[in-house]
């Protein structure tokens, strides 16, 4: 009995709970009072009115943001680039031209020397002895020649009186000639001995920088020593050998025909610092078939020792100046299926694609040879979001006003 009563009470409680939930649901969805509805409508209207300007601003914010720059007309220098190695204008391995003991070295390693400076001495005594002997033989043969000439003069008088035969006169004449020949040989021997003595003093054959010595004082050296005494490199001036593609040969030849040798700049390994400026000296007479390049040589004064033999440098050679060329930022030029193109802007900030033809690049600029005129606004950033005819928003940038002017080359 108690169990049935409890069960009935639970069912009654559940029914009451369900009824309460249904009542609360219908009371919340009942339409609001007229005053409340009007207030809600007013708030809604105010919200819409106040948000209309924000909606327009939101619409503007959906425009693709881009940066732009104006193309311009300028005189653009045309440079060819290449990799080069610094080489001494002249390199000499200083060797002795006579054999003997090295008695002295008159230089410091690394110093600059001038042509004719005394650099080393070989023991001169053996050569002085040879010179003395040659001079003695010369004196002896000079006396013999004088005697034979005097005899010839007597024979010439005697033959007139038939006191001697004609054959004896001819014999004496031949003796004089033999003595004259011996005298010439003696003179040559003296000159040779003097030359050997002079060679015992070794002088600088060129002006340049002394390297590290290859032999010490006291050693016996010969003219056939492979390493020699020291190496001298001429660094004032100095040369750079570099290569350019064979396709540029005609451009270089035309530049040489202008009357002035092309200007060549040497830059450091990182291509960040200009080291020196010189001129093109010569071009090789054949192309390297393995690389498709040709060698050129440039010469630099190098008075500041900015270049050193075997140094690696980057080369920039000016071969021409393009007058009144249309230039645009390199960032504006894109590559598509139909070739290179740019996005141009009209006065309504609408973009359109324009096919262009380009040539040389100079810094952050590229020369446009077809498809663009000067003072045309082109997109430089935000290009990946553009479509034909789309309206864009130009955001400030250092390139917005104009492309960077070419220093000293602006037309």
From Swiss-Prot:
GO CC, alphabetical: efflux pump complex; plasma membrane
List the Gene3D superfamilies hit by this protein, alphabetically.
2.40.30.170, 2.40.420.20, 2.40.50.100, Helix hairpin bin
Q: Which residues form the signal peptide?
A: 1-19
Keyword hit for Transferase: no
Where do the record's region annotations for Disordered lie? 31-58
Q: Where is the composition biased (Polar residues)?
A: 31-49
User: Per the record's keyword annotation, is Cell membrane included, yes or no?
Assistant: yes
Which of UniProt's keywords are assigned here? Cell inner membrane, Cell membrane, Membrane, Signal, Transport
Spell out the molecular function terms from Gene Ontology. Answer: efflux transmembrane transporter activity
- What is the membrane topology noted in the UniProt record heading this document? Peripheral membrane protein
Where does it reside?
Cell inner membrane
InterPro entries per the UniProt record, alphabetical: CusB_D23, Multidrug-R_MdtA, RND_pump_MFP
Query: Which portions of this protein are annotated as coiled-coil regions?
Result: none
Pfam families per record: HlyD_D23 (PF16576)
**How is this protein organized at the quaternary level?**
Part of a tripartite efflux system composed of MdtA, MdtB and MdtC.
Similarity comment text for this entry: Belongs to the membrane fusion protein (MFP) (TC 8.A.1) family.
Q: How is this protein named in the record?
A: Multidrug resistance protein MdtA
What taxonomic ancestry is recorded? Bacteria, Pseudomonadati, Pseudomonadota, Gammaproteobacteria, Enterobacterales
Q: Which gene encodes it?
A: mdtA
């Amino acid at each position: 009995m108690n169990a049935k009563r409890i069960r009935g009470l639970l069912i009654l409680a559940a029914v009451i709970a369900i009824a309460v939930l249904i009542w609360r649901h219908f009371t919340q969805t009942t339409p609001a009072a007229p005053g409340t509805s009007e207030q809600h409508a007013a708030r809604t209207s105010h919200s819409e009115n106040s948000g209309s300007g924000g909606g327009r601003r939101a619409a503007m914010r959906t425009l693709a943001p881009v940066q732009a720059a104006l193309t311009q007309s300028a005189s653009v220098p045309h440079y060819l680039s290449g990799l080069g190695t610094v080489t001494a204008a002249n390199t000499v391995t200083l060797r002795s031209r006579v054999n003997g003991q090295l008695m002295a070295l008159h230089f410091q390693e690394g110093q600059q020397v001038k042509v004719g400076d005394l650099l080393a001495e070989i023991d001169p005594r053996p050569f002085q002895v040879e010179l003395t002997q040659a001079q003695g033989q010369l004196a002896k043969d000079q006396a013999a020649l004088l005697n034979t000439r005097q005899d010839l003069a007597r024979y010439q008088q005697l033959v007139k009186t038939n006191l001697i035969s004609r054959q004896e006169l001819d014999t004496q004449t031949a003796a004089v000639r033999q003595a004259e020949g011996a005298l010439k040989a003696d003179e040559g021997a003296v000159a040779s001995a003097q030359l050997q003595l002079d060679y015992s003093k070794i002088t600088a054959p060129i002006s340049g920088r002394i390297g590290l010595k290859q032999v010490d004082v006291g050693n016996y050296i010969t003219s056939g020593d492979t390493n020699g005494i020291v190496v001298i490199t001429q660094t004032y001036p100095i040369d750079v050998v570099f290569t350019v593609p064979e396709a540029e040969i005609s451009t270089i030849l035309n530049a040489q025909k202008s009357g002035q040798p092309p200007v060549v700049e040497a830059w450091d390994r990182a291509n960040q610092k200009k080291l020196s400026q010189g001129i093109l000296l010569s071009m090789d007479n054949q192309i390297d078939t393995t690389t498709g390049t040709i060698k050129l040589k440039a010469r630099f004064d190098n008075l500041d020792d900015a270049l050193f033999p075997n140094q690696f440098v980057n080369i920039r050679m000016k071969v021409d100046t393009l007058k009144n060329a249309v230039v645009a930022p390199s960032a504006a030029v894109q590559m598509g299926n139909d070739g290179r193109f740019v996005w141009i802007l009209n006065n309504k900030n609408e973009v359109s694609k324009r096919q262009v033809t380009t040539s040389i690049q100079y810094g952050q600029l590229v020369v446009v040879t077809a498809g663009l005129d000067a003072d045309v606004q082109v997109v430089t950033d935000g290009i990946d979001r553009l479509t034909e005819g789309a309206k864009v928003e130009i955001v400030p940038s250092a390139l917005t006003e104009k492309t960077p002017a070419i220093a000293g080359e602006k037309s």
